[in-house]
């Protein structure tokens, strides 16, 4: 009997993948149809290549959603021609943590840059009291909460509200990016408990404003000299204007000082370290917004510093093509194509000749494993309509009734 190598659908709706189909490869919004965004520049991610050690994400830094205007910001988004390198073997940095510097500290799933909470200015230019981008530059953010830097690099310091459905509080948020230490960045919602149990809840930060009446000390207890003092707290320099106005309290919230935690997620059923964006109950961004002042993991070279983000794709790298199939050992490819992914509603399915004449069972499930669609289909081109469902992650399962099945994780967004 022919032996099929097939993927199994677990009860918790996890997609078990080979090393070539892990989330750091499959979580990107690929532009497969030549779509353009701002300035008629190609949008989203142009290509994804991978080796056994790294993933190479090629992007213009222009999203697929409409951006602008930027009140009081004279900068114009431009093609950055980035090639970001994401390690496939992220690890905790057990030594001195690496600070998240100015400029890009990670990349959203659409190829747009992640910036930290700073806006590049500090009181008296000393780098001690650093301005928080949201209260100081927030007026220049567009409706998607992004804006361009002087070099034309469009970016988000805070929750990228147009990238995913941040109002969907009943499902675990999808991966919406990767930090440069290789760990995933999720949207605002996760499992109540880090072991993957409990309700879906909004992830709450452990940071809060300090109870201070002057700026003469730092949150870690450092007593400053008079020349290092920050400005008096008043209406011109209110508490919260500087990131040093915040302190981390371990007993608060779900997340650590890096704005993440070790936890189970839909894409990582065995657990991973994961960052989360933080918002309040009204979806207003909450400090530190994305990744904290330091990375949790070790940061490889190539993405930061002068010229960072312009890596060379190795000649032997494999290009990721957004079609997932099942290999029939010794007899070619038993393949199902599913596209586009992400989708704003319709998912097209195509079948290889191995399926000719077969009747198959189609199941579409949400992130909790609830079956939304179940029907018998012929092995011909099909269209699955998700337009009536909330944005989020879905799983398409196609079974042949003989023990083999095809699974594809689909991201639906607006």
Question: Which residue stretches match the model-derived regions?
Answer:
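A recurrent domain-boundary module in secreted/ectodomain proteins
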Residues: 111, 279-327
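Bacterial Sec-dependent N-terminal signal peptides
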Residues: 1-23, 331-333
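Short linear interaction motifs
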Residues: 64-68, 132-143, 249-259
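Extended, compositionally biased non-globular segments
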Residues: 183, 197-302
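C-terminal outer-membrane/trafficking sorting elements
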Residues: 6, 327-339, 343-414
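Extracellular-facing segments of soluble proteins and assemblies that are Gly/Ser/Thr-biased and enriched
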Residues: 99-183, 189-192
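A short, polar beta-strand/turn micro-motif
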Residues: 55-102, 158-198, 288-297, 322-323
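Solvent-exposed N-terminal domain segments of exported/luminal and surface proteins
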Residues: 21-135
């Amino acid at each position: 009997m022919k032996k099929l190598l097939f993927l199994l659908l677990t009860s918790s709706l996890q997609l078990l993948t080979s090393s070539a189909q892990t989330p750091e490869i499959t979580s990107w919004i690929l532009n497969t149809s030549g779509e353009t965004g701002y300035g008629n520049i190609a949008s989203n991610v142009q290509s994804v290549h991978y080796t056994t050690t790294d993933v190479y994400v090629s992007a213009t830094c222009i999203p697929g959603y409409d951006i602008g205007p930027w009140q009081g910001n004279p900068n114009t988004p431009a093609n950055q021609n980035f090639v970001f390198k994401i390690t496939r073997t992220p690890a905790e940095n057990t030594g001195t943590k690496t600070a998240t510097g100015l400029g890009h500290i990670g990349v959203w799933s659409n190829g747009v840059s992640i910036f930290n909470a700073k806006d590049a200015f500090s009181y008296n230019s000393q780098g001690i009291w650093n301005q928080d981008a949201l209260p100081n530059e927030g007026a220049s953010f567009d409706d998607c909460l992004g804006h361009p830097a002087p070099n034309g690099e469009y970016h988000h310091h805070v929750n990228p509200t147009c990238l995913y459905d941040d109002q969907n509080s009943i499902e675990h948020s999808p991966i919406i990016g990767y930090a440069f230490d290789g760990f995933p960045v999720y949207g605002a919602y996760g499992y109540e408990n880090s072991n993957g149990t409990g309700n879906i809840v909004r992830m709450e930060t452990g940071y809060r404003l300090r109870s201070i009446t002057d700026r003469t000390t730092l949150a870690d207890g450092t007593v400053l000299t008079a020349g290092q003092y920050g400005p008096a707290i008043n209406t011109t320099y209110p508490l919260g204007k500087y990131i040093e106005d915040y302190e981390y309290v371990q007993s608060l919230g779900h997340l650590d000082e890096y704005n993440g935690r070790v936890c189970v997620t839909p894409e990582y059923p065995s657990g991973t370290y994961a960052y989360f964006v933080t918002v309040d109950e009204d979806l207003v961004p909450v400090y530190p917004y994305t990744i904290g002042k330091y990375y949790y993991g070790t940061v490889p070279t190539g993405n930061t510093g002068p010229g960072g983000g312009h890596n060379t794709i190795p000649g032997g790298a494999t290009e990721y093509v957004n079609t997932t199939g099942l290999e029939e050992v010794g007899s070619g490819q038993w393949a199902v194509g599913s596209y586009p992914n992400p989708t704003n509603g319709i998912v097209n399915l195509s079948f290889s000749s191995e399926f000719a004449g077969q009747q198959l069972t189609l199941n579409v499930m949400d992130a909790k494993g609830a079956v939304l669609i179940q029907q018998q289909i012929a092995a011909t081109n099909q269209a699955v309509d998700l337009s009536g469902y909330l944005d989020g992650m879905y799983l398409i399962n196609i079974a042949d009734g003989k023990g083999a099945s095809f699974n594809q994780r689909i991201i639906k967004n607006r």
